[in-house]
């Protein structure tokens, strides 16, 4: 056997996220300024990666919205950084959009304790993911977004395969090309950010791109569900002084009411900015405004169009 053949047999194939980033080679010899500049330049890649998958994001948003309007729920599932990003995005939905905590849920291998401690040994156990979904009564009505930078994590792939088997909507988010991981879901979003500054540390560029994609997906879905008017969070949960000030500001800007009136409206509506706005803009009483909102499926703009039509 030739030396060439011997050499080729010893070559290790590394998936994209495990490859060496030549621009950050000898990183430990760099000055602080050089390190920061390397990071700054590398962090342009996540934005480019997101721009390349805009069609897939649009498809995902529309399909998720359709499922949620039909009493479905949205689940994120992942391990390590990927799991933490899913839990983070899900946990922001109730305070930002006043959603029921059951509507958008994040599942991380190992449960809540894995948010602060490593549970990497669970990444390779696909059966646990299936059990985690069954514990939440996951059904064909629901949506599963499996987050796996490598596109290979057994825990995530097991969850996606189970979801497909019961006809739930399945979406994957990975950071590798098809040659590194063959995924076959309803929608596969590949955020190609290239080798990491620290080889294999996908909490960096891959994680940043994933966070950007999740921001776009969840926020866009909530807009489609009527949780936003203009660019204002009209379904926010008024749970502290900062959010109370924000709610008053929204009523002042859109409803053209002063601070005293805004506070009175929020008291009447148990802190509902959306309902308070409808009352301020239409002159309706609480009961009639609430009924109109229900008839308009919670969409303030639709409700206001109906008021003008009458």
Curated annotation (Swiss-Prot):
InterPro entries: Etherase_MurQ (IPR005488), Glucokinase_regulatory_CS (IPR005486), MURQ/GCKR (IPR040190), Reg_chr_condens (IPR000408), SIS_dom (IPR001347), SIS_dom_sf (IPR046348). Belongs to the GCKR-like family. MurNAc-6-P etherase subfamily. A lyase-type mechanism (elimination/hydration) is suggested for the cleavage of the lactyl ether bond of MurNAc 6-phosphate, with the formation of an alpha,beta-unsaturated aldehyde intermediate with (E)-stereochemistry, followed by the syn addition of water to give product. Pathway: Amino-sugar metabolism; N-acetylmuramate degradation. SUPFAM superfamilies: SIS domain. This is N-acetylmuramic acid 6-phosphate etherase. The lineage of its organism: Bacteria, Bacillati, Cyanobacteriota, Cyanophyceae, Synechococcales. It is an enzyme of class 4 (lyase). It comes from the Bacteria. Its EC number is 4.2.1.126. Homodimer. Specifically catalyzes the cleavage of the D-lactyl ether substituent of MurNAc 6-phosphate, producing GlcNAc 6-phosphate and D-lactate. PANTHER family: GLUCOKINASE REGULATORY PROTEIN (PTHR10088:SF4). One of its GO terms (biological process) is N-acetylmuramic acid catabolic process. Coiled coil: none annotated. The active site is at 92 (proton donor), 123. The keyword Protein biosynthesis does not apply. Keywords: Carbohydrate metabolism, Lyase. It catalyses: N-acetyl-D-muramate 6-phosphate + H2O = N-acetyl-D-glucosamine 6-phosphate + (R)-lactate. Residues 64-227 form the SIS domain. GO terms for molecular function: carbohydrate derivative binding; carbon-oxygen lyase activity; ether hydrolase activity.
């Amino acid at each position: 056997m030739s030396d060439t053949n011997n050499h080729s047999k010893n070559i290790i194939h590394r998936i994209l996220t495990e490859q060496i980033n030549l621009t950050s080679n000898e990183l430990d010899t760099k000055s602080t300024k050089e390190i920061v500049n390397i990071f700054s330049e590398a962090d342009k890649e996540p934005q480019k990666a997101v721009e390349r998958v805009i069609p897939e994001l649009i498809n995902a948003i529309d399909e998720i919205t359709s499922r949620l309007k039909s009493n479905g729920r949205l689940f994120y599932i992942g391990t390590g950084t990927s799991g933490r990003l899913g839990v983070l995005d899900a946990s922001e939905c109730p305070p930002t959009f006043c959603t029921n905590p059951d509507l958008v849920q994040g599942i991380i291998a190992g449960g809540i304790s894995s948010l602060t401690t490593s549970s990497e040994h669970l990444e390779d156990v696909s059966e646990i993911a299936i059990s985690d979904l069954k514990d939440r009564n996951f059904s064909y009505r629901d949506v599963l977004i499996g987050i796996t930078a490598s596109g290979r994590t057994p825990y995530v792939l097991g969850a996606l395969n189970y979801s497909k088997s019961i006809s739930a909507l399945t979406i994957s988010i990975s950071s590798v090309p098809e040659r590194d991981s063959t995924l076959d879901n309803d929608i596969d979003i590949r955020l190609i950010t290239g080798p990491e500054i620290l080889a294999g540390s996908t909490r960096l560029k891959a994680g940043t791109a994933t966070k950007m994609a999740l921001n776009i997906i969840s926020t866009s879905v909530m807009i489609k569900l009527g949780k936003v008017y203009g660019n204002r969070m009209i379904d926010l949960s008024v749970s502290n002084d900062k959010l109370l000030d924000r709610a008053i500001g929204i009523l002042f800007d859109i409803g053209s009411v002063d601070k005293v009136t805004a506070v009175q409206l929020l008291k009447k509506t148990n802190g509902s900015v959306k309902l308070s706005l409808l009352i301020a803009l239409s002159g309706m009483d609480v009961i009639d405004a609430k009924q109109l909102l229900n008839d308009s499926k919670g969409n303030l703009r639709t409700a206001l169009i109906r008021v003008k039509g009458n």
